[in-house]
């Protein structure tokens, strides 16, 4: 199965696992937004520290604007393979296409590490 058109770079599984862990920690000790509408608002307002986008969203148009918007606002974003796993990490009973960490809380070090790794990955793919 090929990647969705909005997936701009490959995220290694170990990094994706750290992303979900960061979302869980931030949910408990910081502040997150769940769902594409809330995530989009957080990005537009410049509140998001990290945006997480699921790779298995259908139709793709639901989240296709997020990478472009994040780049425009200089907000880092990362992908996870499953909207179901992202929903669970957010504490939801349902899947979510995207989420944003506004205040990382106890996940601050993890979020910083994720952003550093994402920048390294994006640096390799953009050249």
UniProtKB/Swiss-Prot annotation:
InterPro entries: eL8/uL1-like, Ribosomal_eL30-like_sf, Ribosomal_eL8-like_CS, Ribosomal_eL8/eL30/eS12/Gad45, Ribosomal_eL8/Nhp2, Ribosomal_eL8_arc. Induction: Constitutuively expressed (at protein level). Pfam families: Ribosomal_L7Ae. Keywords: Cytoplasm, Ribonucleoprotein, Ribosomal protein, RNA-binding, rRNA-binding, tRNA processing. One of its GO terms (cellular component) is ribosome. Its main location: cytoplasm. The keyword Manganese does not apply. One of its GO terms (molecular function) is rRNA binding. It is found in: Cytoplasm. The keyword Mitochondrion does not apply. GO terms for biological process: ribosome biogenesis; translation; tRNA 5'-leader removal. Signal peptide: none annotated. Part of the 50S ribosomal subunit. Component of box C/D small ribonucleoprotein (sRNP) particles that contain rpl7ae, FlpA and nop5, plus a guide RNA. These sRNP particles form homodimers, giving rise to an asymmetric holoenzyme. Probably part of the RNase P complex. Belongs to the eukaryotic ribosomal protein eL8 family. Multifunctional RNA-binding protein that recognizes the K-turn motif in ribosomal RNA, the RNA component of RNase P, box H/ACA, box C/D and box C'/D' sRNAs. This is Large ribosomal subunit protein eL8.
């Amino acid at each position: 199965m090929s990647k969705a058109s909005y997936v701009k770079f490959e995220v290694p599984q170990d990094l994706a696992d750290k992303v979900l862990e960061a979302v869980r920690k931030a949910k408990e000790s910081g502040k997150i937004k769940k769902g594409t509408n809330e995530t989009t608002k957080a990005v537009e307002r410049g509140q998001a520290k990290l945006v997480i986008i699921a790779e298995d969203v259908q139709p793709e148009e639901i989240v296709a604007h997020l990478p472009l918007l994040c780049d425009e606002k200089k907000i880092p974003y990362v992908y996870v393979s499953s909207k179901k796993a992202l929903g669970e990490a957010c504490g939801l009973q349902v899947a979510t296409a995207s989420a944003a960490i506004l205040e990382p809380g106890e996940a601050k070090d993890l979020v910083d590490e994720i952003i550093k790794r994402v920048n390294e990955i994006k640096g390799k793919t953009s050249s």
